[in-house]
A protein has these predicted regions:
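Acetyl-CoA-dependent GNAT
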Residues: 3-92, 96-98, 109-111, 115, ...
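Conserved beta-strand-loop-alpha-helix junction that forms the acyl-donor binding cleft
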Residues: 100, 126-137, 153-160
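Conserved active-site alpha-helix within GNAT-family acetyltransferase domains
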Residues: 106, 131-149
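Conserved GNAT acetyl-CoA-binding A-motif
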Residues: 117-128
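Short, Lys/Arg-enriched, disordered terminal segments
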Residues: 1-9, 119, 159-161
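Conserved G/P- and acidic residue-centered "switch" motifs that form tight phosphate/ATP-binding loops
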Residues: 103
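Active-site beta-strand termini and strand-to-loop segments that position acidic
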Residues: 68-70, 158-161
Length: 161
């Protein structure tokens, strides 16, 4: 039996090598406009890394992690930290289509939660989800997130205490 190694790496949208790799991966994942809309509703198709960075990654309080299976990146998540409120906002969670519904998104969110609890002493997570993205809503609810507001998008929160 071939056991695959799962690991997590922190990447930066200010590092040119990371940007090059992320551009290749995200361009592939976002070749479907529906996937881009579910992940980042404010971004227009086709995906452009420069627009992605300028709209979402100019704040220095953003941390991004990728999930690797063996040496292949199959997942991405970002969070914006608010140290004053001891909270973080999750965004841009995506798993490569071939690896969806296998628990990798759950592992990626749990990894981020543990980082926040252990190292940063944060106690609250929030996120927004597109209403039509039922699989994401089910994932977040299974992880203990609660719906706090429904408008154009669904706002969810989770206490980490």
């Amino acid at each position: 039996m071939n056991v695959q190694k799962v690991s997590f790496i922190e990447v930066s949208y200010t590092n040119n090598d990371d940007i090059r790799i992320l551009n290749a991966i995200l361009s592939s994942w976002f070749s479907d406009p529906k996937i881009l809309h579910f992940t980042a509703p404010n971004h227009q198709y086709p995906f452009k890394i420069s627009k992605w960075i300028s709209l979402s990654y100019t704040d220095q309080n953003i941390i991004t992690f990728c999930l690797k299976l063996d040496n292949w990146i199959i997942g991405h998540i970002s969070m914006k930290l608010n140290a004053e409120e001891k909270s973080a906002h999750l965004f841009h969670l995506i798993i490569d289509e071939k690896y969806r519904n296998k628990g990798y998104a759950k592992r990626l969110v749990k990894h981020v939660e543990q980082k926040l609890i252990d190292k940063e002493k944060f106690n609250r997570l929030s996120l927004n989800c597109v209403k039509k993205n039922q699989s994401a809503l089910a994932l977040y609810q299974s992880l203990g997130f609660s719906i706090v507001k429904e408008k154009k998008h669904i706002k969810m929160v989770k206490d980490l205490k």
